Amino acid sequence: MTAYDMEKEWSRISITAAKIHQNNDFEGFTYQDFRTHVPIMDKDGFAAQTERCLERNERNCLIGFTSGTSGNIKRCYYYYDCEVDEDSSLSNVFRSNGFILPGDRCANLFTINLFSALNNTITMMAGNCGAHVVSVGDITLVTKSHFEALNSIKLNVLLGVPSTILQFINAMQHNGVHINIEKVVFTGESLKTFQKKIIRQAFGEQVSIVGVYGSSEGGILGFTNSPCHTEYEFLSDKYFIEKEGDSILITSLTRENFTPLLRYRLGDTATLSMKGDKLYLTDIQREDMSFNFMGNLIGLGIIQQTIKQTLGRSLEIQVHLSVTEERKELVTVFVQASEVDEDERVRIETAIADIPDIKEAYQKNQGTVSVLRKDARDYAVSERGKMLYIIDRRN
């Protein structure tokens, strides 16, 4: 792996960017000119640009609402056909890599928990690959006869976020039906080790698992089918990517987006590096993964780092914030029961309590920490079906 050179990449794509964004100045810009003259697009800037596009756009669109990681409702528009620039279309990305092929029979799990926008765009994308698509709907209403019906059509692909894929597996097994799934395509969040284990236990070690990195505003940005599923190949013909401080910014290089993105801040951070002529993203995470505890800002990363230093390995954790009956703030850190014994749980609890900004709350006798073992499948998820990292119930 070598470092990503934004100056060099800008030189490669500046003419394309000038055409897509109808700004001839871009052709003569150096990358530093681009940074200086083009402001970063935030959520408000995206909304304003969307309104301008609505005023002049004659094509009909799908309107999708998504809560985002923040929980705030935001509106996005998508072209119905998903095929604007054929050479870089979403469907070609999936077809050319063999993720979804003609004749595949795909279960669209984005209809679980009201994923309306992803439901339609994923259905259209899979359809354009030549695949057949069935929308599963609310998994709590799916019975044994429904799973038998899915078996009868030779269902072989699952499309969804990790938690909805696990919901499907749990319901399938509860109803005593086995479906021979050959491929699992996940997006929306990273695939945890325990989730991957459950998928392989359900469908066999040979099942193909593909991860898709994307955003509501930009669509599909990258993909991974590496064994670790943490190294995403970025679609550098679709977007120009920058790293400004810790922030990831993207600029559209095709006409696929209803709202063209120009230095749009995703709210993610990642490590950018090159392998040959391909750009890869690793260590993708949200920029702000922290919480306020007794006046101190505690990053989720420092807790994860403390656990790794204590045990010599990483764990998937979930943090709950609450208030005790004595009106003291309580930080409860859930760790995987299958990965941690009682002795290790105590060691983790002691180590977290010794984090300086947390220890201060102990010294004031105003806060406390508890570490509990829990089945990772019982970790709380959001209304969108994503695993929550920090849950604040102090109100």
From Swiss-Prot:
GO MF entries: ATP binding; indoleacetate-lysine synthetase activity
SUPFAM superfamilies according to UniProt: Acetyl-CoA synthetase-like
Catalytic activity: (indol-3-yl)acetate + L-lysine + ATP = N(6)-[(indole-3-yl)acetyl]-L-lysine + ADP + phosphate + H(+)
Protein name: Indoleacetate--lysine synthetase
InterPro entries registered for this protein in UniProt: AMP-binding_CS (IPR020845), AMP-dep_synth/lig_dom (IPR000873), ANL_N_sf (IPR042099), CapK_Type1_Caps_Biosynth (IPR053158)
The UniProt record lists the keyword Metal-binding: no
PROSITE patterns: AMP_BINDING (PS00455)
Lineage: Bacteria, Pseudomonadati, Pseudomonadota, Gammaproteobacteria, Pseudomonadales
Family statement: Belongs to the ATP-dependent AMP-binding enzyme family.
